[in-house]
Amino acid sequence: MARDKETIHSKPTLGQNYPNPFNPSTTIKYELPRSSEVRLSVYDLLGREIAVLVNERREVGGHEVKFDASGLASGVYLYRLKTDDFVQSRKLLLLR
């Protein structure tokens, strides 16, 4: 059984934001199997980085970040989690 747990948590996970669609704020959760340098950023669809939510070393475990999009236009945005050895992106939808 311990082997299964190790396999499940061998790499970071990036959850879907909630609520989604959202207005004006949403929550993003991610989990780290080991401490790591973390950068969690939000991008527009042209690839421009519009917000950096986390840019520091984080410890093992679950983490949660709120994103306030109060100054942004309605539309689809991407958020990306980058660690020492992992990168994943997901879409989020801002509706005004």
Locate the predicted segments by residue:
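Generic structural signal for well-ordered beta-strand positions
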Residues: 50-51
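Glycine-centered coil/turn sites that cap beta-strands in beta-rich domains
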Residues: 1-18, 22-42, 64-67
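Short beta-strand edge segments in extracellular beta-sheet folds
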Residues: 92-96
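Extracellular and select intracellular beta-sandwich modules with Ser/Thr-enriched
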Residues: 86-90
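Short, surface-exposed loop/turn motifs with a glycine/proline- and acidic-biased composition
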Residues: 54-84
